[in-house]
Amino acid sequence: MDHDDALVGRLLTRREAVRLMGVAGAAGLFGSNLLAAQDRTTTCVVRPELIEGPYFLDASSNRSDIRVDASSGKARDGVPLIVTLGVAQVTAGQCSPLPKALVHMWQCDAVGVYSGVSDPQIGSGNPQDNALRGTQQTDTSGIARFTTIYPGWYRGRAVHIHFKIRTEASGQAYEYTSQLFFPETLTDEIHARAPYAQHGRRDTMNERDMIYREAGEQLLLRPTKTSSGYEAPLSLALDLSDAAVGRSDAEGMRGRGGRGRGGRGRGGL
């Protein structure tokens, strides 16, 4: 189903965003490098919030390469992936890069395990383990870049990465939380390799994932192959005047997220 022209809450649609700033402005907002692998008309789209889930840790290290566990010095095995987020702000009908925003990113490893949590099914059990978790501050162009691995899977969820953006650019604390998803064909190809293959075939495709079905197509990455792995850019805009979106996830007991309300489900969120 094509959600390009469907409203999600107060979100701008792709068509509205293009009218807002014009195609030329959309192409130039973050520069051609970020947008080379994606549709340039999506630059100023306000994308949906989705649920935070139970595995966010607020003590993530400030670093770009999040593959290494700082406590052991060991890197998580997996196909290298560079995720580049271009963050903009919508103010008075104009879209501009948002500098100095704090971007958190966290995900499971190639066999579906989250670092730093004690969940017996998908947690590493070591509270000092911080692999595949980290934060970056957006630069003057609104860019934050993470070097990670293509994520694995765990029961009940499609393959995904969590991220959170915090800023006080509007004069008060603003927090946006969502998730990134991946094309099925690429996931099948990568998960057939080691170390992913040892975990078996995933049990939940995108269209069967309760979070993806809410708005996942608007947060679907389009990774492109590089000499060492893959890279995946995504641009998104924040409406800092939207207090409902900008309130802390802690206020909603980590169950808030656009229309993504709900409990932990079969295997965490």
Can you annotate each of these PLM segments?
Residues 1-16, 23-30:
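N-terminal secretory signal peptides
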Residues 20-23, 164-166:
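Alpha-helical and His/Cys-centered functional microenvironments
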Residues 36-37:
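Boundary at the C-terminal end of the N-terminal hydrophobic targeting segment
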Residues 40-215, 233, 237-254, 268:
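Beta-strand-dominated extracellular/periplasmic modules and repeats
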Residues 213-224:
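Low-complexity, intrinsically disordered Gly/Pro/Thr-rich segments
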Residues 226-231:
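Extracellular interaction modules
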Residues 256-269:
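Long, low-complexity intrinsically disordered regions enriched in Ser/Thr, Asp/Glu, Pro/Gly
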